[in-house]
């Protein structure tokens, strides 16, 4: 999963394959195989977002969210999973936190997320492990039964200590068949450890297991899709970063289709979704991951044209948060064929490909028509509020998020206040 562009620049090698053309599905909201609890409406929350971005757990639109994917935890090559920022995760004292509590207690984002869970019983929290920057040790961590067991046990230990509802693995990406096989074995080990913990301390509760998955065929063709579909609850298909500063021409960041050949679109969401389903992943387990940011192109004559440079960004060059992307003098252009949107300023020749509420509605209509599991967003701090919120737009179009309840009772947590449910 991104940091996003410092990481995305390294994806150049994955952006070589060209997808075939796709025919759009019909527009009506045809619902196929809807989950009993409703649709997923998940979002990544980054622990580094509490710093410069000043985006705190309490800022999450919790009532509109089914899953918060808390990113990221790190891992060692022996499989041990650990906090990459303990101050943000468990130490930071928020305004209502006491400095005089007795015992061993957890604070930071972990406590704040638990309090959100108590107030919003349909919001589940997932520990997200890895990400683009911290995927280096996955091959070693997944390579033996011992390291896989170490990963599973250490991940589940943190999960129960922190009061979370599941684990999300973000391995970017298995490089060959051996690693793809080991990925499945790692996930199976995690599933077994989750079930063993539930049997002992949370009988009847199902801890969830998901992964972040690539939308580029050069990466997903290496995966054992059918096996992943069996062991996982959800596959969050990262249908974004289809183009960027590494590209040869400006293009959509996250288009649904690629029916206009002149746009030089290297990827499209529909092609990836169909390939995952053909590969054996149940459609209901595919969650469509959407961007809350835009990629920019400088000195270009329009979409599908050459460009020179990525320009500035909100936090990294070439990436604009959705909430601040609007530029004076730029025209907004909705591509009804490929289902993409971009702004273009002819005076400075700047193009920014970004999703909007209308595009989000199109994508929710699409995922419903395909029988997919729901939506996921990267990442929370980039969104707007109110009617312009992409997370909120998705939630409303889905009919509200998945209503299955979270877990509040963690009797085996090492933290006194977690065992007491923050009473």
UniProtKB/Swiss-Prot annotation:
GO molecular function, a single term: chitin binding
GO biological process assignments: chitin catabolic process; polysaccharide catabolic process
GO (cellular component) term, any one: extracellular region
Residue spans of biased composition, Polar residues class: 383-407
Biotechnological and industrial applications of this entry: When expressed in tobacco plants, chit1 confers resistance against Rhizoctonia solani.
Signal sequence residues: 1-22
The protein's name: Endochitinase 1
Gene that this sequence comes from: chit1
